[in-house]
């Protein structure tokens, strides 16, 4: 579904890690090819493994890391993709950091401790929190926020709330109140989607346009 709120790619061979596999020929080939494809598909997050070292990139705009704001714990409405490389959950092996100055790496860690990453997704946020598995202390956390566009709906809510009931017929006023109530409830609904917002905005606009003034003959 191309219209889903969040898009995640998961595959094994990390293209943005900081251990020895980062310089493998097949990894370099993937790094030269895949980011463009991911950009075209509007991917938000890429989760990877293989090179057993924790690495979180900056937001990557194509092949270019956005380092303008330094290392952040969250971004809002970003351009680009976040790439995260897992370390090892089993502790079977750990790879040392060989590229500590990699320009794409915002956070890297090799403490030779097992790690796990929890992903929590809502309509407006995508949070990745990585823990040390031995005591569940936090190694790193990062959240991407996407704000919903509610400006048009909020403008119509204000317009509707400023109208005088006495000026309009009961039937048209009741239709307006139903649309207004739905829009206001949606404004504070954490699970609302942009499609929900757009539909409520349209319904409220139609209700306002459909108001009939008292004493006006519509026949």
Each language-model region and where it sits:
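Metal-dependent phosphoesterase/phosphodiesterase active-site architecture
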Residues: 1-9, 14-20, 36, 41-45, ...
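Short amphipathic alpha-helical segments, especially helix-boundary/capping motifs
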Residues: 9-11, 31, 156-159
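Charged helix-capping and loop-helix junction motifs
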Residues: 26-32
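Alpha-helical structural signal in soluble globular domains
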Residues: 33, 37-41, 60, 186, ...
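Beta-rich interaction/scaffold domains
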Residues: 148-219
């Amino acid at each position: 579904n191309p219209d889903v709120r969040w898009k995640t790619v998961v595959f094994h061979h990390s293209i943005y890690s900081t251990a020895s596999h980062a310089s493998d020929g097949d990894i370099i080939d993937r790094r030269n090819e895949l980011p463009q494809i991911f950009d075209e598909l509007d991917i938000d997050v890429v989760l990877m493994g293989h090179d057993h070292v924790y690495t979180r990139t900056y937001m990557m705009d194509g092949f270019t890391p956005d380092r303008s704001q330094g290392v952040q714990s969250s971004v809002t409405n970003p351009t680009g993709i976040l790439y995260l490389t897992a370390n090892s959950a089993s502790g079977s092996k750990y790879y040392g950091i060989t590229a500590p100055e990699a320009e794409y790496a915002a956070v890297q860690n090799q403490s030779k401790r097992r790690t796990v990453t929890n992903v929590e997704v809502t309509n407006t946020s995508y949070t990745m929190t990585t823990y040390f598995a031995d005591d569940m202390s936090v190694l790193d956390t990062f959240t991407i926020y996407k704000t919903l566009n509610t400006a048009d709906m909020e403008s119509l809510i204000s317009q509707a709330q400023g109208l005088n009931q006495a000026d309009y017929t009961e039937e048209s006023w009741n239709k307006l109140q139903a649309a207004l109530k739905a829009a206001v409830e949606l404004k504070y609904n954490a699970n609302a989607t942009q499609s929900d917002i757009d539909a409520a905005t349209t319904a409220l606009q139609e209700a306002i346009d459909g108001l009939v003034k008292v004493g006006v003959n519509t026949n």
